[in-house]
């Protein structure tokens, strides 16, 4: 098997993905155009942009995330990156005024690889139930510091990496992806 790439401009995500897989993940630093669509269509569009960069035997992984606030009927969803521009403290305030802090974090991981000379694309989802809590400070990167997983006493961003990697939405999606990769010979099966 060739190389396994993770296409992202986010070095924090790259580090997290590398910690989730028992394989050598090569960084593919390619800015991608993000369309406004469903999580699955966004990931498929990203895959279409990076497939020309890989060769026979290689694989490339992309990802996207969404956060659905129950009190806002699923908003911001895939627009979470734009919504975060107002700051984590403001998001906490908005959710507090609505009176329903329930939220679901979603991760969609996509993989493209060649099989018998043809590109094969697959997507895998992970979701994590939780709630939005008051921000300790503003300007924190991402939603991890205001997202409290159900049954946890710590926000995702406050957890030690190994604990976060056991429960996160990205972990759930990456487990499904790793199982697929092992089933088609991209990586060795766990324990092999």
UniProtKB/Swiss-Prot annotation:
Assigned keywords, A-Z: Cytoplasm, Hydrolase, Magnesium, Manganese, Metal-binding, Nucleotide metabolism, Nucleotide-binding, Nucleus
Disulfide pairings: none
Principal subcellular localisation of the protein: cytoplasm
One annotated Gene Ontology cellular component of this protein: nucleus
Swiss-Prot/TrEMBL GO biological process terms: deoxyribonucleoside triphosphate catabolic process; nucleotide metabolic process
Primary role: Pyrophosphatase that hydrolyzes non-canonical purine nucleotides such as inosine triphosphate (ITP), deoxyinosine triphosphate (dITP) or xanthosine 5'-triphosphate (XTP) to their respective monophosphate derivatives. The enzyme does not distinguish between the deoxy- and ribose forms. Probably excludes non-canonical purines from RNA and DNA precursor pools, thus preventing their incorporation into RNA and DNA and avoiding chromosomal lesions.
Listed name of the protein: Inosine triphosphate pyrophosphatase
Organism from which the protein derives: Encephalitozoon cuniculi (strain GB-M1) (Microsporidian parasite)
